[in-house]
Swiss-Prot record:
Transmembrane recorded as keyword: no
Record GO terms (molecular function): calmodulin binding; DNA-binding transcription activator activity, RNA polymerase II-specific; RNA polymerase II cis-regulatory region sequence-specific DNA binding
Protein name: Sex-determining region Y protein
Record's GO cellular component terms: cytoplasm; nuclear speck; nucleus
Chain coiled-coil ranges: none
Source species, domain of life: Eukaryota
Subunit note: Interacts with CALM, EP300, HDAC3, KPNB1, ZNF208 isoform KRAB-O, PARP1, SLC9A3R2 and WT1. The interaction with EP300 modulates its DNA-binding activity. The interaction with KPNB1 is sensitive to dissociation by Ran in the GTP-bound form. Interaction with PARP1 impaired its DNA-binding activity.
Keywords recorded for this protein, A-Z: Activator, Calmodulin-binding, Cytoplasm, Differentiation, DNA-binding, Nucleus, Repressor, Sexual differentiation, Transcription, Transcription regulation
Ranges annotated as DNA-binding: 1-57
General function of this protein: Transcriptional regulator that controls a genetic switch in male development. It is necessary and sufficient for initiating male sex determination by directing the development of supporting cell precursors (pre-Sertoli cells) as Sertoli rather than granulosa cells. Involved in different aspects of gene regulation including promoter activation or repression. Binds to the DNA consensus sequence 5'-[AT]AACAA[AT]-3'. SRY HMG box recognizes DNA by partial intercalation in the minor groove and promotes DNA bending. Also involved in pre-mRNA splicing.
Keyword Magnesium: no
Length: 57
């Protein structure tokens, strides 16, 4: 099952790739990691909840 970061990064990866078409996948992954770490617990909460929901399916 996907964890909270994976749930969040699915949509974010797409946006980041569209905004930076020449950026390589490894750099996109690094940027996603930095951005995830900068989110507050409140901003992350919906993604933890969705990951938990997916886990129970």
């Amino acid at each position: 099952p996907m964890n909270a970061f994976m749930v969040w990064s699915c949509g974010e990866r797409r946006k980041l790739a569209q905004q930076n078409p020449s950026m390589q996948n490894t750099e996109i992954s690094k940027q996603l990691g930095y951005r995830w770490k900068s989110l507050t617990e409140a901003e992350k909460r919906p993604f933890f909840q969705e990951a938990q929901r997916l886990k129970t399916l």
